[in-house]
Amino acid sequence: MKNILIIGATGQIGSELTMNLRSIYGNDHVVAGYIKGAEPKGELLESGPSEICDITNAQNIADVVNKYNIDTIYNLAALLSVVAEGKPLLAWHIGIGGLWNVLEVAREHGCAVFTPSSIGSFGPGTPAYKTPQDTIQRPKTIYGISKVTGELLSDYYYNKYGVDTRSVRFPGLISNVTPPGGGTTDYAVDIYYSAVRGEKFICPIAQGTYMDMMYMPDALNACVQLMEADPARLVHRNSFNIASMSFEPNQIYETIREELPGFQMEYQVDPLKQSIASSWPDCLDDMCARKEWDWKPQFDLHSMTLDMLEKLSARLKA
């Protein structure tokens, strides 16, 4: 039975991944790591163990690993893309300094490590359509630079020390549970909230700007599936392209209007978000993930929209 530590367990991905992993491996086998000021609440707190686990403090991480006999670490501590641009030193301190701490603890204690990368690891020189698994990256944001560095550092620890590091490059993630928190792709979450509330949506991303997106249930499955994959099949480790759907703002708007014909949207482009979005690929080629660990998403734009509207409507009425 795995003993898992999730660092950043109260964040956008971590809060849902923690509950998902507890449903698979048992509540007592998944520790929710958090920092002061971001304590777990409700079911996340009550369903299993939680510990302060500051990624910038290697001894703190080691203490939690020892206490719970941890063998697998999901490292989800990071600043989101737009937030990171306003706090570049902090973004690097958490994203790279913190990752180094995690990898050192993993090396000393024999832990496997999952540290997600992102479509933000690519830059304007990257082939935009069907972005290959192995290609030029050269991102222009501190978020992307830290993601590329994290990929390389994780591979270094695997090649030099044998640490079982694995990773995926997440597209923009869309959740019906966790509210948006400052990412470039978060417009694709905000738009559903506006639709369910009967409000006009003000879109910060220009029409025609395609980005890869993924529904959170598929993202959670990818995390688990990759960490359970046979290591003998893995040619790539850090980090796999994974894809589900690619769309631009008007497409998601029209898909919502099929269910809510009165929904309205107008564009007020945010220059910072747009500059970041324009530097990212339109869609990724994920054939390596499909070949090496049988990756296959379950949701497309239409099925995600139906589920988002249903789940958000029920939640906002409760």
Language-model segments: residues:
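Conserved glycine-rich Rossmann-like NAD(P)H-binding loop of the short-chain dehydrogenase/reductase
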Residues: 25-39
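Conserved Rossmann-fold NAD(P)-dependent oxidoreductase catalytic core, especially the SDR/UDP-sugar
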Residues: 75, 100-142
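Rossmann-fold cofactor-recognition segment
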Residues: 45-57
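N-terminal Rossmann NAD(P)H-binding glycine-rich loop of SDR-like oxidoreductase domains
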Residues: 4-24
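Short alpha-helix in the Rossmann-fold core of NAD(P)-dependent oxidoreductases
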Residues: 92-99, 146-147
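NAD(P)H-binding glycine-rich loop region in Rossmannoid oxidoreductase-like domains
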Residues: 55-94
